[in-house]
Amino acid sequence: MSTRTKALNAYRHGLRATRIAFRNDAEVLLAARAKMRSGMLCPPDPKLTTEDQIQHLEDVAVFLRRNLVQGKKVDGSSTKEPRYHLNIHKDTELGDNETIADPTARVKTNLKARPFKCSDKKQ
């Protein structure tokens, strides 16, 4: 595969990742895409090889898809503490503190998986 094709594929993956991560936030979505476009036209670290720059863009796309979750404050909450709606999607990594500390642990990506609670702590 040519370098041009790899770069275009990485750019498309980045655009898809921004669409997923910033789904309901047009201002941030446009800013992220503008930053990605400017990074493609004028790379921030020209010392890196083209292959390394493409790999960096792929890594950023994976990070956006798996690790970035936006929250939006919910109005009209009956409690004193504010409530937030989180944009958790099918690609969001769900884990607990033990899996974060252990790099070999498998991370749950299924939203049907029950999240870890403090009361679930093994005794």
Swiss-Prot record:
Summarize subunit and interaction data from the UniProt record for this chain.
Interacts with RIP1.
**Function text:** Assembly factor required for Rieske Fe-S protein RIP1 incorporation into the cytochrome b-c1 (CIII) complex. Functions as a chaperone, binding to this subunit within the mitochondrial matrix and stabilizing it prior to its translocation and insertion into the late CIII dimeric intermediate within the mitochondrial inner membrane. Modulates the mitochondrial matrix zinc pool.
A GO cellular component entry from the record: mitochondrial matrix
Q: Give the transit peptide range.
A: 1-24
Q: Which GO terms describe its molecular function?
A: protein folding chaperone
Other noteworthy facts: Present with 279 molecules/cell in log phase SD medium.
- Report, from the record, the phenotype seen after gene disruption: Leads to respiratory growth defect and increases frequency of mitochondrial genome loss.
What species was this sequence derived from?
A: Saccharomyces cerevisiae (strain ATCC 204508 / S288c) (Baker's yeast)
State any GO BP term from the record.
mitochondrial respiratory chain complex III assembly
Q: Where in the cell is it found?
A: Mitochondrion matrix
Hey, which family's this protein in? Belongs to the complex I LYR family. MZM1 subfamily.
Q: Which UniProt keywords apply?
A: Chaperone, Mitochondrion, Transit peptide
Q: Which InterPro entries match?
A: Complex1_LYR_LYRM7, MZM1/LYRM7
Does the keyword field hold Transit peptide?
A: yes
**Protein name, as recorded:** Mitochondrial zinc maintenance protein 1, mitochondrial
